[in-house]
């Protein structure tokens, strides 16, 4: 994947955990705003090796780590849809669930018919069953680092998401914590962009300085 915008002479490749430092406050603010309001035809471009633009729905943006709700309706909708797809790929499990749902439905229908009121009912789908069971992410994060790791784990699970963007996360993480996150990102083959307003320790990073020159630091 690649990133491009007007101040760059050429696109920046996004591989694993990429750190991009924007030293000019106005530029940093503007790029964060572009990410927040991202559209396929916006000035900020994310695209793959085939020059295909990354869709808004394929990007996960985290501007407030502590305030990020891993059980928001948007996240849960994606998780439930992925679970449904998993069941569809396992015919034996899906068949077993369908039989159990049919049995439960028959019992409820019988009671509806016995009731004096003229009751209606609908068949329940696997997706509706997942929702009714209240399937959600169990959160156990006590620190900002643990919350970041939790977000990465959720992002890994969401197959329709292609890019995760952390904004100014380095301000809350130690060098060892950033290293641990980078290791996890590398091992799980994720694509993550860290947007930072200042240099992030001595990790490999791209730095767009206040004169708008792009510098690479600590690159192997």
UniProtKB/Swiss-Prot annotation:
It holds the Pfam family Cas_Csn2. The keyword Protein biosynthesis does not apply. Ca(2+) 2 binds at residues 118, 138, 142, 150. The keyword Cell cycle does not apply. One of its GO terms (molecular function) is DNA binding. GO terms for biological process: defense response to virus. Keywords: Antiviral defense, Calcium, DNA-binding, Metal-binding. Binds up to 2 Ca(2+) per subunit. CRISPR (clustered regularly interspaced short palindromic repeat), is an adaptive immune system that provides protection against mobile genetic elements (viruses, transposable elements and conjugative plasmids). CRISPR clusters contain sequences complementary to antecedent mobile elements and target invading nucleic acids. CRISPR clusters are transcribed and processed into CRISPR RNA (crRNA). Binds dsDNA, binding is disrupted by EGTA. NCBIfam families: cas_Csn2. This is CRISPR-associated protein Csn2. It comes from Streptococcus pyogenes serotype M1.
């Amino acid at each position: 994947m690649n990133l491009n915008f007007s101040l760059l002479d050429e696109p920046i490749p996004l591989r694993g955990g990429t750190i991009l430092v924007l030293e000019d406050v106005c530029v940093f603010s503007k790029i964060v705003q572009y990410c927040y309001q991202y559209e396929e035809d916006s000035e900020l471009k994310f695209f793959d090796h085939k020059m295909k633009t990354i869709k808004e729905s394929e990007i996960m943006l985290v501007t407030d780590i502590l305030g990020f709700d891993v059980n928001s309706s948007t996240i849960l909708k994606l998780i439930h849809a992925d679970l449904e797809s998993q069941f569809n790929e396992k015919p034996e499990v899906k068949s077993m669930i369908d039989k159990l749902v049919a049995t439960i439905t028959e019992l409820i229908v019988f009671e509806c018919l016995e009731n004096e009121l003229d009751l209606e009912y609908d068949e329940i789908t696997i997706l509706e069953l997942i929702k009714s069971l209240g399937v959600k992410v169990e959160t156990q994060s006590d620190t900002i680092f643990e919350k970041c790791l939790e977000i990465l784990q959720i992002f890994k699970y969401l197959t329709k998401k292609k890019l995760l963007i952390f904004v100014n996360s380095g301000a809350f993480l130690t060098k060892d914590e950033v290293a641990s996150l980078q290791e996890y990102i590398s091992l799980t083959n994720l694509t993550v962009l860290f947007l930072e307003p200042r240099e992030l320790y001595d990790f490999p990073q791209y730095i767009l300085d206040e004169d708008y020159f792009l510098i690479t630091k600590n690159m192997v």
